Design a protein with these regions (language model features):
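Conserved small-domain helix->loop->beta segment predominantly found in fold-type I
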Residues: 281, 292, 296-344, 354-371, ...
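Short acidic (Asp/Glu) and glycine-rich catalytic loops that position anionic groups and cofactors
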Residues: 17-23, 48-55, 173, 254-259, ...
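Conserved PLP-enzyme active-site core in the AAT-like
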Residues: 68, 72-312, 345
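A short glycine-threonine-serine/GTX helix/turn-capping micro-motif
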Residues: 27-30, 259-268, 384-386
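A generic structural motif
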Residues: 153-156, 283-287, 332-334, 381-386, ...
Length: 443
């Protein structure tokens, strides 16, 4: 075993990290845990290799076996999403979005998307808002798109269809993008796509948060509802490695996507994660529908349990959510604990990991992302650990102890650790003797 002190220090920190997650309740809505089978593929020799170019047309030699892996990966993904073409070159969901923007827009074209303050993702963000004030963003800014926002019902947590129809006709964008990072309910794709096409807009659906629910047939079906393309990361409700994919609804879009993907947006496309994604897709083909159903059941059950304990879970009249995500207004704790950042830190001390999040009305209350009025909760990772509805009651009790009863978070952390003892293996995946957060040692 290596004895270098710096190596040993790095390893000791990694071991602490793995130990923390083995004893925590993971509720980040944008994360998940891969199976040991996926991790095995992701640390294969492919971590060292390049495969520029397309299957059978590589720039580098030595890729005959990787070609087989990528071909199988794409075949499985096309089956899951019922699509004629999928590209797995993007190394993230943001790069997948950037690929679509590159394929179907040019600089200064107009894009309409969900704004960040009401739950939109930064990859739809502009360089500047229409007001001229700097907002920030990633792919939208890099593409230098002129971004305006789809009208949104900030209290119903969904797009305002009537106002959106009017706005699309007035704005005449080149691209309309659905999807969000606070994605509680299906977006009205079927209602708005004909209007977007009427003005000549390309319609993309950013499925990063809900791709697993879509593949598991428990959410909407954007391609059948009219979207031209769908982009997604592969590590949220779809429990694969961190990567991105672009999905086309029809063959005539393929060449533009391919040109944008390579040599446009990617060179090396992280072959080890393609292999991991292939295994994740094989797992999802077998277990995905049951997993997706339980993810939504758990989210609804946790929302109800928190609501019954006095927490202001948004949209109770709509059943809280139709996805994996809950949004909780914690502004009533402002005087006892603080706002979102303070609540997030207090939960983290108790080994409960949920992130602060803007509420759609925070901008009215003059709150910002550094210390917003909400927290966001996701059920997808705890579902992967085998938790079901009865465990949602226990988790809600922990929230009550920490935030309402103001119990010492360190004491609650011990209770959380004891609770987690029964949930150490991956469910809805291929069997393994490895635990979910085991650290793989070389010696």
């Amino acid at each position: 075993m290596p004895s270098d002190p710096e190596f040993m220090k790095i390893r000791s920190i990694l071991l602490k990290h793995h130990d923390y997650w083995s004893n925590a309740i993971p509720l980040i809505a944008s994360e998940n845990v891969t199976s040991p089978a996926v991790r095995e593929a992701a640390i294969s020799d492919l971590v060292h290799r390049y495969a520029e170019g397309w299957i059978g047309e590589r720039v580098y030699p030595g890729n005959q076996y990787f070609d087989e892996i990528e071909e199988l990966c794409l075949k499985l993904l096309k089956e899951l999403f019922n699509a004629p073409f999928i590209d797995a070159r993007p190394i993230s969901g943001v790069v997948a979005n950037l690929t679509v923007y590159t394929a179907f827009t040019k600089a200064n074209d107009k894009m309409m998307a969900i704004s960040i303050p009401v739950g939109g993702h930064i990859s739809s963000g502009p360089l500047k808002a229409t007001t001229g004030a700097f907002i920030g963003g990633t792919a939208g800014a890099v593409s230098r798109l002129d971004v305006s926002y789809i009208p949104f019902d900030r209290y119903g947590l969904n797009i305002d269809v009537d106002k959106a129809i009017k706005a699309i006709r007035e704005t005449k964008p080149k691209i309309v993008q659905f999807g969000a990072s606070v994605f509680l309910f299906p977006h009205p794709v079927q209602d708005l796509t004909p209007i977007a096409h009427e003005v000549g807009a390309h319609v993309n659906y950013d499925a990063a948060h809900v791709a697993g629910l879509i593949a598991g047939k428990q959410f909407q079906d954007p391609l059948r509802e009219g979207a031209d393309t769908m982009t997604t990361s592969t590590h949220k409700t779809f429990p694969g490695p961190q990567k991105g994919i672009v999905i086309a609804s029809r063959n005539e879009l393929i060449e533009k996507i391919k040109a944008a993907a390579f040599p446009g947006m990617t060179s090396n496309h992280h072959l080890m994660h393609v292999a991991g994604l292939a295994v994740a897709a094989a797992e999802f083909k077998k277990f995905g529908e049951a997993y997706s159903k339980q993810v939504i059941k758990n989210a609804k059950a946790l929302g109800q349990a928190l609501y019954e304990r006095g927490f202001k879970v948004v949209c109770p009249e709509k059943g809280f959510t139709e996805s994996h995500t809950l949004l909780v207004d914690i502004s009533n704790f402002q005087h006892s604990i603080g706002l979102g950042a303070d609540v997030e830190h207090r939960l983290e001390k108790a080994h409960i990991v949920a992130n602060r999040n803007l509420l759609p009305w925070d901008i009215i209350e003059k709150r910002n992302y550094r210390n917003p009025g909400g927290i966001r909760i996701g059920s997808q990772e705890i579902t992967r650990l085998g938790m079901k509805e009865k465990e949602m009651e226990v988790i809600a009790d922990f929230f009550e102890s920490i935030l309402i009863d103001l119990k010492n978070p360190t004491e609650v952390a011990s209770e959380v650790s004891e609770f987690r003892e029964d949930f150490q293996t991956i469910h809805y995946g291929f069997e393994s003797s490895w635990k979910a957060y085991d650290y793989i040692k070389i010696a």
